Structure formats: structure tokens, C-alpha cells
Amino acid sequence: MSSFEDADTEEMVTCLQMTLYHPGHQRSGIFRSIKFFNREKLPTSEVVKFGRNSHTCNYIFQDKQVSRVQFSLQVFKKFNSSVVSFEIKNMSKKTSLLVDNKELGYLNKMDLPDKCMIRFGDYQFLVEKEDGESLEFFEIQFSLSKKPLLQENNWLSQEPIPECGSYSSCLTQNNSPMEVGENEW
């Protein structure tokens, strides 16, 4: 028997392909901490965090508009399934997260679809999952888009999440003029 025949079979690893876009990425260096086009192997037991805090986040955005921890991804396995899935949780108190136009408030979470658009502020992430067999590891690979992903992929468009934190709270604010007495501020 040759060593080739004795070698362990290499398991295919699930990979999240994440294409990132921000309109100011070229001039501001927002993504300078992210290694593009390399597959990074991570244990499935790890909760992957995205944000601006370099001490707690795996992937850092150099932008004060981003929360210390913006969102997290965690691996899980559905009952009677042989492949891993991901859940996404909004960790930001100040900004909602949109996943395929479903709004997640602070600490809300949902299963991450196999292909989806994640958005907050001016950030756009196109996420595509490639299934693998490994239950021990998964990979993340980043690429950068120079064009808005919403337009490039004909995604149902909405405006960026406003500064007030969520679409629903901004829509309910009364923007019409109000009469105030001279002793009222």
C-alpha cells in the first residue's frame, strides 16, 4: 500500500464568500484590516465578530460610524442535516442590520440564508455560502466591490439605514412643523 492510499481524505470545508462595498472605501481605508482574496480557516466553535473594536472583533472596520461590535456570525447544525449553517446577530445598539430587507434590532438574530445581502449604514455585504462536509472548521473569503452591490446584483433596493438607527423608528417620527409657545423649548 502506498502512502497515498493510507492518507486521510481531506474534508471539504464550508466557505462564506463575502463581497464588501462601502462608497468611501478607497479614500478612507475602512477595510485596510481585512485580508482580501485569502481563505481564512476558523473553528466552528468560534463566534465571528465584525466591528471596529480590534480587541474583540475578528474583522475590523476602520470607521467611527461602526459599532464596537456591529454583528456576529455563529455556526450551527440543523437537526438531521449534514452541513453547517450560520446565524447572524445584530450586536449594535445604535444601528439596525438588514438581512435581505429583514430588519434586525439589537440582539435580534436569524438564520443566514445561503445567499443574502447584509446592510447597515452605507455598508453592503453580499454573502454566498459554499457547503462543505467539515463540522470542525469553516472558511471566510473576502472580496471587494468597486460598485454598489445592490445595483450590481439587482437586489431590492432601500435607502441606507439612517442615523436614527432603524427604518421603522425614523418613519414614525413626526417631521411636520410643530407650534411651540414662547416659554416652551
Swiss-Prot record:
The protein's organism comes out as Bos taurus (Bovine)
Origin: domain of life = Eukaryota
Name of the protein in its database record: TRAF-interacting protein with FHA domain-containing protein A
Q: Which residues form the FHA domain?
A: 48-104
Q: Name one Pfam family in it.
A: FHA
| Keywords attached to this entry | Cytoplasm, Immunity, Innate immunity, Phosphoprotein
| Family to which this protein belongs | Belongs to the TIFA family.
- Residue numbers of Phosphothreonine PTMs: T9
Cite the post-translational modification comment: Phosphorylated at Thr-9 following detection of ADP-D-glycero-beta-D-manno-heptose (ADP-Heptose) by ALPK1. Phosphorylation at Thr-9 by ALPK1 leads to the formation of an intermolecular binding between the FHA domain and phosphorylated Thr-9, promoting TIFA oligomerization and TIFA-mediated NF-kappa-B activation.
The family database entries (PANTHER family) matched by this protein are listed as: TRAF-INTERACTING PROTEIN WITH FHA DOMAIN-CONTAINING PROTEIN A, TRAF-INTERACTING PROTEIN WITH FHA DOMAIN-CONTAINING PROTEIN A FAMILY MEMBER
